[in-house]
Swiss-Prot record:
Described purpose of this protein according to its UniProt entry: Involved in telomere length regulation.
Highest taxon of source: Eukaryota
Organism (species): Eremothecium gossypii (strain ATCC 10895 / CBS 109.51 / FGSC 9923 / NRRL Y-1056)
Localization of this protein: Mitochondrion
InterPro entries: Ribosomal_mS41 (IPR039603), SAM_Ribosomal_mS41 (IPR019083)
Transit peptide: 1-10
This protein's name: Small ribosomal subunit protein mS41
Transmembrane segments: none
GO cellular component terms given for this protein: mitochondrion; ribonucleoprotein complex; ribosome
Signal peptide location: none
Length: 122
């Protein structure tokens, strides 16, 4: 059993180490430019990466957590890094705006209450 666990652990580490690190482009020459381009105030964390391209691609979620990056920005940065690694376009994805009536589950109830309040107010 120990051998099986060791084999799977080594395979996972080898897979993670073999992931390609793309070369900097003229559009995105360094880490600070990348973080500024993806938006959502991620450029605040540029000094954490020490402007090293390898740090951007080698650091994972726990490492960013250790450095003090908030959860939402951490997930967003890792998503954009993976998109760059796969050759996709790097652009800002704006945060969604929450609906006035809340989520899908209680929408009918909230709309009914709101309409009742509107009728009583008028």
């Amino acid at each position: 059993m120990l051998q099986t666990r060791l084999f799977h652990a080594c395979a996972a580490l080898a897979r993670a180490a073999s992931r390609p690190v793309p070369k900097p482009t003229s559009e995105i020459p360094d880490v600070s430019t990348f973080l500024a381009k993806i938006g959502r105030q991620c450029s605040e964390h540029a000094e954490l990466y020490e402007n090293k391209w390898e740090n951007l691609f080698m650091w994972d979620g726990p490492k960013l957590k250790e450095k003090g990056v908030p959860v939402q920005q951490r997930r967003y940065i890792l998503q954009q890094v993976e998109r760059l690694r796969q050759g996709g376009p790097v652009r800002e994805i704006r945060e969604g705006k929450k609906s006035f009536f809340g989520g899908e589950r209680k929408r009918k109830e909230k709309v009914a209450k709101w309409r009742a309040e509107q009728r009583h107010a008028a």
